[in-house]
């Protein structure tokens, strides 16, 4: 009986200890340490959300307009460009949201599977973007240098796009193969491995864990080299054509000047003998030659403007691709040489946000700058504005002055009785 109060005290102390342990566990679960600083998370998440909205909206607009106009889908160039826009939509829907999830995860959560999926998406985006840009570069070269004998026919373009998607899917699977995700004997051993995610565990420095970086780096540099060589050849081809045509045009001008002088001499000689008919003939020939010279000058100016436009677009395409994807490619090379660390992983996320910016630039560079696409977009906007104006009539018979709507269209002509009588009496007066 004397041990009963001691037992009660021990039971109370043990219950107090267990309650405190439970409270401590709840506190640690509620306040888990974040993998990144709050300002870092907010800024990068804001940029990524902006890229999702702008990239998804612009690429879907381009795809809808391409599908609505059948004449835009018939060409090989537009099909290859549509393939790039489909890829950008996939990146905006799948890859960028997963990067946001990686940013907002805590350190103590089990992020192995999510990190593996994220690395697979990054590998897919990097490889497929580089290959699609490479295909568009070859198509531009084929159009500019060999317009008569094109290498990329419709069948070859379909085969090229099929191979692009197969290789992109293989690049998506490489991070899973690195961690033995598909092997039956591994069990849950892959779950302890982290692929370039900030965590409490150490990074794996084995080369077999970073084969996906070894695939991304050479494809990027190969695409850059091909772009530089191809666009320089395109510009050289345009210069040669303009120069040769311009020189032949000058020769034609000199010949035409000689013919003008000969024609004037002939007209002066013949005018002394045969009078006014030869003078009229000489004037007609001189006028036709002047018109031909004006047309030649106009064509030369149009070629010069086209050359400047192609040169500017080539610089923009190359510079945007280099600006967006060079930092992350160089950082991947640094990770392969020095090994991963928290600082390098954070920098890699920043550079990945820059790389995702191509989803916004691709529609601006490859779709909205084309004249056919601009015509289709303007026509759709005009029809939309006209339908809105006609569907919502203004009260009190208000008149809407719109430059896109012909004011003379659907205009009813009304005459008063006096005007009708005057118009009916006018022919009778004339006949009388």
UniProtKB/Swiss-Prot annotation:
Subcellular localization: Cell membrane
Stretches in topological domain Extracellular: 1-45, 107-115, 178-208, 336-348
PROSITE patterns the record matches: G_PROTEIN_RECEP_F1_2
Topological category with respect to the lipid bilayer: Multi-pass membrane protein
Glycosylation sites: 16, 192
Keywords recorded for this protein, A-Z: Cell membrane, Cilium biogenesis/degradation, G-protein coupled receptor, Glycoprotein, Membrane, Receptor, Transducer, Transmembrane, Transmembrane helix
GO BP of this protein: cell projection organization
GO molecular function, one term: G protein-coupled receptor activity
Induction cue: Decreased expression in heart following aortic banding, a procedure that mimics cardiac hypertrophy produced by high blood pressure.
Signal peptide limits: none
Tissue expression pattern: Abundant levels detected in the brain and heart and no detectable expression in other peripheral tissues.
Knocked-out gene: effects: No visible phenotype, however mice display increased susceptibility to heart failure under conditions of hemodynamic stress.
Keyword Transmembrane carried by entry: yes
Spans through the membrane: 46-66, 86-106, 116-136, 157-177, 209-229, 315-335, 349-369
InterPro entries reported for this sequence: GPCR_Rhodpsn, GPCR_Rhodpsn_7TM
Segments on the Cytoplasmic side according to the record's topology features: 67-85, 137-156, 230-314, 370-432
SUPFAM superfamilies tied to this protein: Family A G protein-coupled receptor-like
Cellular component aspect of the GO annotation: plasma membrane
Keyword Transport (UniProt): no
Family: Belongs to the G-protein coupled receptor 1 family.
Known role: Orphan G-protein coupled receptor. Seems to act through a G(i)/G(o) mediated pathway. May be involved in ciliogenesis.
Protein name: G-protein coupled receptor 22
Organism in which the protein naturally occurs: Mus musculus
Gene: Gpr22
């Amino acid at each position: 009986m004397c041990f009963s109060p001691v037992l009660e005290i021990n039971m109370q102390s043990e219950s107090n200890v267990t309650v405190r342990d439970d409270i401590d566990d709840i506190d640690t679960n509620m306040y888990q340490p974040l993998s990144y600083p709050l300002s870092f998370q907010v800024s990068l998440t804001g940029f990524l959300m902006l890229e999702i909205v702008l990239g998804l909206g612009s690429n879907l607009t381009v795809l809808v307009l391409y599908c609505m106009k059948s004449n835009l889908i018939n060409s090989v160039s537009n099909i290859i460009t549509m393939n790039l826009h489909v890829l950008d939509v996939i990146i905006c829907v799948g890859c960028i949201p997963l990067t946001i999830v990686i940013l907002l995860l805590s350190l103590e959560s089990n992020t192995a599977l999510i990190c593996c999926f994220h690395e697979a998406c990054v590998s897919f985006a990097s490889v497929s973007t580089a290959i699609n840009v490479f295909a568009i570069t070859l198509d531009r070269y084929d159009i500019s240098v060999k317009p008569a004998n094109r290498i990329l026919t419709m069948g070859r373009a379909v085969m090229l796009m099929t191979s692009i998607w197969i290789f992109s899917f293989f690049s998506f699977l490489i991070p899973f193969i690195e961690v033995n995700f598909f092997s039956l004997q591994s069990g849950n051993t892959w779950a302890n491995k982290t692929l370039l995610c900030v965590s409490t565990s150490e990074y794996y420095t084995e080369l077999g864990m970073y084969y996906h970086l070894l695939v991304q780096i050479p494809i990027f540099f190969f695409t850059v080299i091909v772009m530089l060589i191809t666009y320089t050849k395109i510009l050289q081809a345009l210069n040669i054509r303009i120069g040769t045509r311009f020189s032949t045009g000058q020769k034609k001008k000199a010949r035409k000047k000689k013919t003008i002088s000969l024609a004037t001499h002939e007209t002066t000689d013949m005018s002394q003998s045969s009078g006014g008919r030869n003078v009229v003939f000489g004037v007609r020939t001189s006028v036709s030659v002047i018109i031909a010279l004006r047309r030649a000058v106009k064509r030369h100016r149009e070629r010069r403007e086209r050359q400047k436009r192609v040169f500017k677009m080539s610089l923009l395409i190359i510079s945007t691709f280099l600006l967006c994807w060079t930092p992350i490619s160089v950082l991947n090379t640094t990770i392969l040489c020095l090994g991963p660390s928290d600082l390098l992983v954070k920098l890699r996320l920043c550079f990945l946000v820059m790389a995702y910016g191509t989803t916004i630039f691709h529609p601006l560079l490859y779709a909205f700058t084309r004249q056919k696409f601009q015509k289709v977009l303007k026509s759709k906007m005009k029809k939309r504005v006209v339908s809105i104006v006609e569907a919502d009539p203004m009260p009190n018979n208000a008149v809407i002055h719109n430059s896109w709507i012909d004011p003379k269209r659907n205009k009813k002509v009304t005459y008063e009785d006096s005007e009708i009588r005057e118009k009916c009496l006018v022919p009778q007066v004339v006949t009388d």
